[in-house]
Amino acid sequence: MTDISTPKGLAVLGAGKMGGILLEAFLKHGLVAPAHVFATVRQTSSERRSISSAQITLGTDNRAAAKDADVILICVKPLAVSAVLDEIRPELNDQKLVISIAAAVSTEYMEKRSGGNVPVLRAMPNTPSMVGEGITAICKGKHATPQHLELARKLFDAVGKTVVVDEKHMDAVTGLSGSGPAFLYIILESLAEGGVKMGLSRELATLLAAQTMLGAAKVVLETGHHPALLKDTVTTPAGCTIDGILELEEGKLRVTLIKAVVKASQRAKELLFSDKEN
């Protein structure tokens, strides 16, 4: 892959939920021509409906998809990665870039399974990518270059923000931004339930909770101020907010959320596929 500013051919192996989201975004932003996209699914008839472009090549043969691609995006479950790498290994070389979004599969493991000096990257996108508000953490293996990282950043920027991290932090990323949307949905649902308890319709309560969460997050991102400082700007002496915060503190919300991220991160570490695995 001499020119790696944009993929000449892209293989998406496992174009299911997240794979399909990424593929649609790449096509929408013109990052790859539909005629140069090769995607695999388990059942072409059922999955075709989730992919808008009929110009892509859709099938079930991973090796065939990887053959003419210079960027190969693996979007299968962690336990399926080894089988996929074994299948496409004859088509891999140092001119192709392999990117895996599978949690807990190390670059060392993928390099070993790929053979040779194949450039490998790990990526951890999250589900808000479906509306272009995701965040993806990427890290590179020993054969990947800064140019490979820039190509990956260009691709994943299509679904939100992209950050480069050391691989040792990928488990923490998984626990925070990977699992985080589920934690936030629970918080959002609970806020809405509070509104319902106080007489609001469920539709209005959900809208208020969702927009409030969105707006608060945007303030943090755009001002760069610490959340604690921003919290204090809402909290007036002897006001409503401080009474609500007291309830949150008594309910140990803060420590519970911290422990949720830690536990999810530890689980990712337990699942880790390293170069020591067969």
Features from the language model and the residues they span:
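Internal alpha-helical scaffold of NAD(P)-dependent oxidoreductase catalytic cores
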Residues: 109-119, 135-172, 185-222, 267
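Short pre-catalytic strand/loop immediately N-terminal to key active-site residues, enriched for Gly-Thr
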Residues: 121, 170-175, 227-232
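NAD(P)-dependent Rossmann-like dehydrogenase/reductase catalytic/cofactor-binding core
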Residues: 2-6, 210-278
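Short acidic capping loops at alpha-helix termini that bridge into adjacent secondary structure
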Residues: 33-36, 94-96, 119, 203
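Small-residue helix-packing motif on alpha-helices
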Residues: 37, 65, 81, 201-208, ...
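Rossmann-like NAD(P)(H) cofactor-binding subdomain of soluble oxidoreductases
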Residues: 22, 44-45, 54, 62-138
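NAD(P)+-binding Rossmann beta1-loop-alpha1 motif at the extreme N-terminus of oxidoreductases
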Residues: 1-60, 64-68, 133, 196-197
